[in-house]
Amino acid sequence: MSNLSPEPHKNRQMAEWFGLDAARYDRARPGYPEALVDRIIALSPGKNFVDVGCGTGISSRPFQAAGCMVLGVEVDGRMAEFARGRGLDVEVARFEDWEPAGRTFDAVVSGTAWHWVDPLAGARKVAGVLSPSGLLALFDNAFELPPAVMAAHGAAYRHAMPDATFQEPPRKPAEDDAEEYAKQIYAKQYVKAAEGIRQTGAFSEPEELRFEWDRTYTRDEWLDAVPTQGGLNHLDEDARARFLAHLGAAIDELGGSFTINYATEGITAIRR
């Protein structure tokens, strides 16, 4: 599920909305599975990390907890300030313009943020700061809402904005096509990133990461999370309130909670 344009790095003002409520973003956005963190640490030659687009530190803290030294690079000063308050060292800059000042690192990671980075310029920057055999790891949480919850979103949107058009996203294919569906999602998310990595000539062939996990949301947890996903940015305050109230009532009718099947997907590449 995504609200991103094909080349979001060319329209970065879209990302500025997220810093308006950094505390909500940090509280409500999903984290990442422990298996992902373990895999990335195992692939890295050491524990000196940079987290590109660290935001409030959601992607950084699991690596810190595992004993890594993590430096965040974040373009939004509001998000950076929140992350600092949670114990993360953060430098404020666009990653492409960030000045590493001669420092090198064992791994560069980016969780749900690389789409805001120019894929070629970003990969070149990474190549310049990684130590020999250093790791680049890009990852994101992909998910599809249960059909009843997706329908509730559509109904709530039509209730809040009766004159607007709500387009339902394409449905997940039948179970026997699940593997092909996963490949399509992977390709959509990371084909441009992989192209940028290859064009530098500085990395091994990118390899896929994929970890599946579930999370159950209560009504209140989901209503807290929805505004952090960007899909309501264009609604005024009254329309947003109508949307959330209608959606909350629908979730109550569905039993008050539901489970999302997440797939944390991404790519890794090794510095030659």
Regions found by a protein language model. Give the residues of each.
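A short glycine-rich, Lys/Arg-flanked "PGG" loop and its adjoining helix->strand segment in the class I
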Residues: 121-132
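Conserved catalytic/acceptor-binding region of the Class I
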Residues: 131-212
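Class I SAM-dependent methyltransferase SAM/SAH-binding core
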Residues: 56-98
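A short acidic, Gly/Pro-enriched loop at the edge of an enzyme's catalytic core
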Residues: 98-108
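A short SAM/SAH-binding and catalytic strip from SAM-dependent methyltransferases
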Residues: 107-120
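Conserved class I S-adenosyl-L-methionine
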Residues: 1-44, 47-53
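Conserved Class I S-adenosyl-L-methionine
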Residues: 183-272
